[in-house]
């Protein structure tokens, strides 16, 4: 009986141990699952927080970039004005490109100071510089921006016009003269408006009396003097007009019949005058045909009447077909500005009053108005 009790107790103890072991395994499992879930939840929260922080950083950077661009655009004109008028550039938090041409707007601003980056980024090969105020800066002269063109600036000038900047080469101050037979330094100096000592110093000549044929000398440039156009002096012009008027006086108050037909016609008076100048009369069925029926290339020049035209003594005046019953009229000018206003002229006429065919109207003076359709013929010769 005692033994049976002990076996039963032993069996119960084993069963209780198994139950406790199972409970422990379940507890450990639940605890492991809980810890795992906790760790997983923490990592997920951390990843989500990191994503939020990164998103905030990206948004903040985007906002800063947009703000910087808007601030750059807002200050764009102000910056240009400062570059042009003050010669100094004050940049914002972002990079700014400076055009060298806009920085040097005129000669007065070349020696002004400008602050630029000590190590500019993304600098182009042209005249543009990138200025960044996040890096150390130093002051330099704008003139240093053109250091690459220093050799060219010795011979070229920069000029500003409406279309921008352009350069032109300065005219040389000296030219080469080759010594010829019979030349002397004094004669050369006189020719080029300089002194003997100046030529000596320029060409390192010790003895001014010793130069050689074919020797090359530097002499000053002299401007080209264009010959003045030949003009007829007022005295010569007045003399020629006087001789013409004197001849025309001999024709006045007389009747002239050059071709022996129809009495004393206007055409007859003009033919007498032209025959005196060139030895022949003029062609034409009527007076209005004179400018077109004759070749005046070597004898005269033809003028059409204009508001500023002034006839000269000795000119032939040809009236259109509105006069003379359709045949026109012609006369010889005595005074091209009879009224002082270029509205009237005086001429020597024949048959103006239709009395020539009866030989009742001699050559006489008549004052006419300038008409739009008048033609004037000016002979090269003077009577």
Swiss-Prot record:
It holds the Pfam family CHAP. Its EC number is 3.-.-.-. It is found in: Secreted. Residues 241-378 form the Peptidase C51 domain. Its main location: secreted. GO terms for molecular function: hydrolase activity; lytic endotransglycosylase activity. This is Probable cell wall hydrolase LytN. It comes from Staphylococcus aureus (strain N315). The lineage of its organism: Bacteria, Bacillati, Bacillota, Bacilli, Bacillales.
């Amino acid at each position: 009986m005692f033994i049976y009790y002990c076996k039963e107790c032993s069996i119960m103890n084993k069963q209780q141990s198994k139950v406790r072991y199972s409970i422990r395994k379940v507890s450990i499992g639940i605890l492991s699952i809980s810890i795992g879930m906790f760790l997983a939840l923490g990592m997920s929260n951390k990843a989500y927080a990191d994503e939020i922080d990164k998103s905030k950083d990206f948004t903040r950077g985007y906002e800063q970039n947009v703000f910087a661009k808007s601030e750059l655009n807002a200050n764009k004109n102000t910056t240009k004005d400062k570059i042009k008028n003050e010669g100094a550039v004050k940049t914002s938090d972002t990079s700014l490109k400076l055009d060298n041409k806009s920085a040097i707007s005129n000669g007065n601003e070349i020696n002004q100071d400008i602050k630029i980056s000590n190590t500019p980024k993304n600098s182009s090969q042209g005249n543009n510089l990138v200025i960044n105020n996040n890096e150390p800066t130093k002051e330099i002269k704008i003139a240093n921006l053109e250091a690459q063109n220093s050799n060219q600036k010795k011979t070229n000038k920069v000029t500003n016009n409406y279309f921008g900047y352009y350069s032109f080469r300065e005219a040389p101050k000296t030219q080469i003269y080759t010594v010829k037979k019979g030349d002397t330094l004094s004669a050369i100096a006189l020719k080029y408006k300089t002194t003997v000592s100046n030529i000596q110093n320029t060409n390192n000549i010790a003895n001014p009396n010793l130069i050689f044929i074919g020797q090359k000398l530097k002499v000053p440039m002299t401007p080209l003097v264009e010959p003045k156009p030949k003009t007829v002096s007022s005295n010569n012009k007045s003399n020629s007009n006087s001789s013409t008027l004197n001849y025309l006086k001999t024709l006045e108050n007389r009747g002239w019949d050059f071709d022996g037909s129809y009495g004393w016609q206007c055409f007859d008076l003009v033919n007498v005058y032209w025959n005196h100048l060139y030895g022949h009369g003029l062609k034409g069925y009527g007076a209005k045909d004179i400018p077109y029926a004759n070749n005046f290339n070597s004898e005269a020049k033809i003028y059409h009447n204009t508001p500023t035209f002034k006839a000269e003594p000795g000119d032939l005046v040809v009236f259109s077909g509105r006069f003379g019953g359709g045949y026109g009229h012609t006369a010889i000018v005595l005074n091209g500005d009879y009224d002082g206003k270029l509205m009237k002229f005086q001429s020597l006429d024949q048959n103006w009053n239709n009395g020539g065919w009866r030989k009742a109207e001699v050559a006489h003076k008549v004052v006419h108005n300038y008409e739009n359709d008048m033609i004037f013929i000016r002979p090269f010769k003077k009577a």
